[in-house]
Amino acid sequence: KYFTTDITPTTTPYEAGLGFCVDLNKGDFIGRDALVKQKADGVTRKLCTLVLTDTDEFVQIYGGEAVHHEGKVVTRIRSGGYGFTVKKNILYAYLPVDLAVKGTRFTIELIEGNLAAEVTANVLYDPKSEKLKA
């Protein structure tokens, strides 16, 4: 997750999956009231990890590509790149919470044409950190 592409001043830590970094009891700070409300009400969108499912070959992702669901643009890609270890194109996008479910399928509008993608686990390699702790 990158600041200025995936995380910006228009997103919140809760939307980005970084709520564990927020200490609402630390005292007053700019945006605290909004975060308290969002934590209580829940988020309307979440930063999700998607992978292209049509190809395992490298595809250039620039950010800003339209994400379609059932023929309708629902959001745009924030960033993407190729995961050489998992041999997949990995994309980040803020999805409406009802679509932010593992396995939900989308069509990504690329310069080369449309490709299928789906929501996947946020951590694709060593999700339990077993290799890191070995």
Kindly label every feature range from the protein language model.
Residues 1-134:
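Conserved, structured C-terminal
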